[in-house]
């Protein structure tokens, strides 16, 4: 087992990793920027070292600083969390070169999965369904036009190195392509340092279904069921649940088998997620991408399987074989997660970080809260606007929905706006209750959801 781990991240995921390490008897070293000097993960870690100014490029993305701290503090492992360097193949390689265990897949696997266009080719060869699209990258508007003509409109232009909804543009007709191509390439270059693009057919009104996978170095690969992440805004997930209500047992088995194939195709090791689009007929699904890290929403899978995914990451990275077999995985009950973001939905989801004047999280049976906030702390403007994840678990989906409603009624944060009220309204929407939400749900219903919230606020009625 690893003896001391550097947690190369911040916020709630740093806390999540820290807690798992403690329970396994692994010592922890936290890193922090000057803006995070009072952060909770800094206070709870065995050691904490400042690695630079607030700007992420000078701190949490500073590979040399992270590796220097890891070696100086006697660490033998590095956990990247999610975001920042978690899917950076060069960082994984640099850790290995420095004699440190990167708690994630190899740099080679990250590269294979990280290039979206190359990953599509790999999946196609492995027998995993992919959406119709270009054969590899499109280097010019002319190539994009030819590919779009072949598969038919509407189409998506997507960054090969993309993620987080960035570097994506929808085109409904040929006249849209030229401007969209330039915009997407520029955004991809700015966000990822790579402007390579590919094109794929847009699946209208799909569901976003993803499968959690675990793989060890001995060739054992399993999936731990599915998550429905269809409630999104700007390609960013807002509410996630497990298992997906829309899947039949037969379809779940087919998609799970495809997820395992996908992991094997890239030579995967550790925890990862294979994302699919499920079309409206609920018969055809298509590989979208593979996330080579722990996911923000991993908690809903933990609740319905009883498997501690971060603990599994640490065990696998320590060279231990998976003890869990596919037949051991049972999905029991239902879990829902609401991401609480410091943003104002009325103002176009404008980030609104600031000081937490007062904070109260919900509790009770079947409730879990993952957050780094406390009353009096500052939510920094330099990083992601997520303030907390609230999870509710119950024997049935409807009970889980009711429990989450109660959680959001209890949740109180004074100091800045959040999207909690919007999530609360979604939980009452008929489409959500019936499990019929597609990725278009929020675009189609946002105005009515916000209007209902406004009327309740003006009337003084507590929803």
Task: Tell me the role of every PLM-derived stretch.
Residues 1-125, 138-146:
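ATP-binding N-terminal substructure of ATP-dependent carboxylate-amine bond-forming enzymes
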Residues 2-24, 34, 48, 71-73, ...:
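ATP-dependent carboxylate activation and anion-phosphoryl transfer catalytic cores
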Residues 133-134:
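Conserved beta3 strand of the protein kinase N-lobe
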Residues 139-142, 152, 462:
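N-terminal non-cleavable signal-anchor helices
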Residues 147-156:
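Acidic/histidine-enriched active-site and ligand-binding environments that engage anionic O-linkages
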